[in-house]
Amino acid sequence: MTAASTLVRAARKSRRLTQQQLAERTHLDQSSVSRSEGGRDAEFSTIQRLLAGAGHRLYSAPTRRDDAATVAAEIREQLSVKDKDRALRALLQLNDNLVAERGLVRGVLGLAEPESTKDPVWDAAIAGLVAWRLRQEGLPAPDWVNAPSRHFRAPRTLDIDPADPDPSGIGSARRVRRAWCPGLA
C-alpha cells in the first residue's frame, strides 16, 4: 500500500463509511475508491477529493516519519502473514518516530485514526503508545485513542513469542525492574 492509499482507507474507516458511501459523496464510482485504497497510483486531485469526502484534508508536515495510521497498516499486514516479530518492530518504530519529533509535529503523527489491525490487543497498544507519547510532550491525545475498542479492563500483553514470560505474577513496577533488569532495582 502507498501512503496515499493508507490515508484514504484510514479516513474512510474513521468515519465508518463504506467504499460505496464515499464514492457517492465524492461523485466517483466505487471502483475508483477501491483502486485508490488498493495502492494504485491516483492523481493528487483524486486523493484530495476522497479525503474531503471522508471529512479529512491532506496537509504537509515537516517530517519524513510514518504516522500511526501508516504504521497500523504495516502491523496489520505483518499480522496477516503471522509475522509478529515484524509487527513488533513496526510498533517500536512508531515509538521511535514519536520520540524523534517535538511539539505539533509529534501530534500530527498521532492525529489520523488508524484502521484496526484486526487484533484488539495491537489496536490498544498503538492507542496507548500514541496517548503516552503525546501527553509526554504536553499535547492532547486525539479522540480515537480513548475509543472503548482500544482499551481493556485488565492489562494484556502482545504475546509475541510463546516463550515470553507471563507478567501477571509480577505485581509492581519495582518487581518488573527486578525481574527484567536486576541492576536497576
What residue spans do the PLM features occupy?
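Short amphipathic helical patch at the helix-1/turn junction of helix-turn-helix
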Residues: 2, 12-14, 41
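Short basic helix-loop element that most often maps to the first helix and adjoining turn
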Residues: 6-21
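Key DNA-contacting residues within the recognition helix of helix-turn-helix
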Residues: 9, 34-35, 48
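Alpha-helical residues within the helix-turn-helix
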Residues: 13, 24, 38, 52
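Recognition helix of helix-turn-helix/homeodomain-like DNA-binding domains
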Residues: 27-42
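DNA major-groove recognition helix of helix-turn-helix/homeodomain DNA-binding modules
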Residues: 44-61
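Helix-turn-helix/homeodomain-like alpha-helical modules used for DNA recognition
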Residues: 64-129
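Charged, low-complexity intrinsically disordered regulatory/assembly segments
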Residues: 116-185
